[in-house]
Swiss-Prot record:
Top-level taxonomic group: Bacteria
Organism annotation: Rhizobium meliloti (strain 1021)
Keyword flag Electron transport: no
Keywords assigned: ATP synthesis, Kinase, Plasmid, Transferase
Lineage of the species this protein comes from: Bacteria, Pseudomonadati, Pseudomonadota, Alphaproteobacteria, Hyphomicrobiales
Enzyme type, top EC level: transferase
Name recorded for this polypeptide: ADP-polyphosphate phosphotransferase 2
Length: 306
């Protein structure tokens, strides 16, 4: 029956997921009933009960407060941190990165999402274009995809030869060991979603004009080559899961839980602690009795439309 308990739970989850789309940016008010109908037609997988919105926000804020402590510790002790986010298209990598960086200093914590290599970069040592983005002391770098493109999208889409992929598998463990020996704290995450969940998220992007930019021709090809990506992922884990930099898999079908679980886990990978801070005193403003404020022409001001 279409009104069975399972069907009701699926519909409830879908409505919560659409509401979460609005929550993500706090700016969007969108009512698109045909969107949920189109997605509901193809969506048949039950989800765990939705995490209550306020519970999610409270947990997220608490974790973000800890991230600020981590940032302060990294700066104080001149630590170097690299976090790699990998996973299938639409797995939620960008979403968790956004929540990590949301309340942090962009001069200290930065995101690297490199485009396809240029013709010049294709002639370089493979890791060369990533090296300039590695952190100095007191910095955290988040890679939204990384050098693992070589054994993922480049391999599956035919942009790298099997010889180049084999060379990568030979080189990457030692490359990462070199980073760790140099003092870099390297953490690697793989965001895992099901075939059906990816389909839902792609369809949401297709029908949401504010998200269509996220959907590339390469994303569409990833649907056709799902099993090839699965094989590539399995070999990647088998050959690059080293003691110095192991992989951590985040179950990401539930975006909110995935964000919280990932941030909580990340905080546990680094032995940060509270660091001393100087007391801040706001100085009094100095008034100059002889200063006469100039009147600026009205055309300099942005119109007060709202």
């Amino acid at each position: 029956m279409s009104n069975s308990k399972d069907e009701v739970e699926r519909i409830d989850w879908l409505e919560a997921e659409l509401a979460d789309t609005i929550d993500e940016d706090y700016e969007l008010e969108l009512s698109e009933p045909t969107l949920s109908e189109k997605i509901r037609e193809i969506y048949r997988k039950a989800h765990p009960p939705a995490l209550p919105r306020m519970d999610y926000f409270r947990a997220l804020l608490a974790l973000q407060a800890e991230l600020i402590k981590l940032q302060d510790w990294v700066v104080y002790h001149k630590q170097k941190v690299v976090v790699i986010f990998e996973g299938r298209d639409a797995a939620g990598k960008g979403g968790v990165i956004k929540r990590i960086t949301q309340r942090l200093n962009p001069r200290i914590v930065r995101t690297v999402a490199l485009p396809a290599p240029s013709d010049r970069e294709k002639t370089q040592w493979y890791f060369q274009r990533y090296v300039p983005h590695l952190p100095a002391g007191g910095e955290i770098v988040l890679f939204d995809r990384s050098w693992y493109n070589r054994c993922g999208v480049e391999r599956v889409m035919g942009f790298a030869t099997e010889e180049e992929v084999e060379q990568f598998f030979d080189d990457v463990p030692e490359f990462e060991r070199m980073l760790v020996r140099s003092g870099v704290r390297l953490v690697k995450y793989w965001f895992s979603i099901t075939d059906e969940e990816q389909q839902l998220r792609f369809l949401t992007r297709i029908h949401d004009p504010l998200k269509q930019w996220k959907l590339s021709p390469m994303d569409l090809q990833s649907r056709v080559r799902w099993e090839a990506y699965t094989k590539a992922k399995e070999e990647t884990f088998a050959r690059t899961n080293i003691r110095e930099a192991p992989w951590h898999i985040v179950e990401a079908n539930d975006k909110k839980r995935a964000r919280l679980n990932c941030i909580d886990h990340l905080l546990k990978q680094i032995p940060y602690e509270d660091v001393p801070h100087e007391d801040i005193t706001l100085p009094e403003r100095i008034f100059n009795p002889n200063y006469e404020r100039k009147v600026l022409p009205p055309e300099l001001y942005v119109p007060a439309k709202y």
